[in-house]
């Protein structure tokens, strides 16, 4: 257990935020270089976990749905949309890899129901084939 966020993330390679917070509590100055952040909690207007400087200071930003992230994700607090926002779909379809040579990458997840359903089907099919043999 850590007394504060700064101590909790000081040596992290991966940070996942998943709270119902309405105020940013993660500061870019506390995030180590070469760290990846999964921001999951901001999934509606008014919710946030990241201070604006985390978005501004991220080298790569990936979103499950960029337009939805600009409306109800962490990106709703950014004064201008980043030109280098990559959708998760394009990252996968284009078979891209995200190189992180000295910076912070951010995944702003707002939740896309169809992706959740597709993943559930894939997991079920895999489970059925391996465990049930059908």
Show where each model-derived region lies.
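Short acidic low-complexity segments
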Residues: 1-12, 26-28
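Beta-loop-alpha module in the N-terminal Rossmann-like domain of NAD(P)-dependent dehydrogenases
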Residues: 18-26, 44
